[in-house]
């Protein structure tokens, strides 16, 4: 993964979303407000917003920071400042710019019943996870820090909790071959715990 001291791990400073974040000093309110303004300036409606919070393993951030960050995102959509995430979410139900989907990134080894409840409390509707590979040997060689079984267990739990799911898979990782990648990709569609 690329490492840029200005960005969360795996993100480059010249990606559009990363550039916007840096331009606004990573302030969640300013990022959302400027993005909404840009959409509206280009003639798009911002009545329904899907908010993607990118930048690594969301679950590894302190929970008070998570609440603050999302509250400020919702404050930008609501057009007023809330004292709590609960208030911000409640106001957003009637706001002119309603959030219709909140996407958070995490890792399979961070998913457990407590984390699932917490993500629901924050209003999360979709979870993105980096599987990267379905081969434990390749994952060990790339120091992923979790196993295929942990990925399967996380997907089963998240699906049972009603989350929409996005799974990132990467071909050509260290230790993989064209043939092993083909087999790996086929497992994405044949494994009942992983397939859409």
Residue ranges and their predicted role:
Residues 1-5:
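Local cysteine-cluster metal-coordination motifs and their immediate loop/turn environment
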Residues 8-34, 51, 55-166, 170-196:
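Conserved non-cysteine loop/helix-boundary elements of the Radical SAM core domain that shape
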Residues 37:
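N-terminal phosphate-binding caps/lids of nucleotide- and nucleic-acid-binding domains
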Residues 41-51:
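Replace the tail clause
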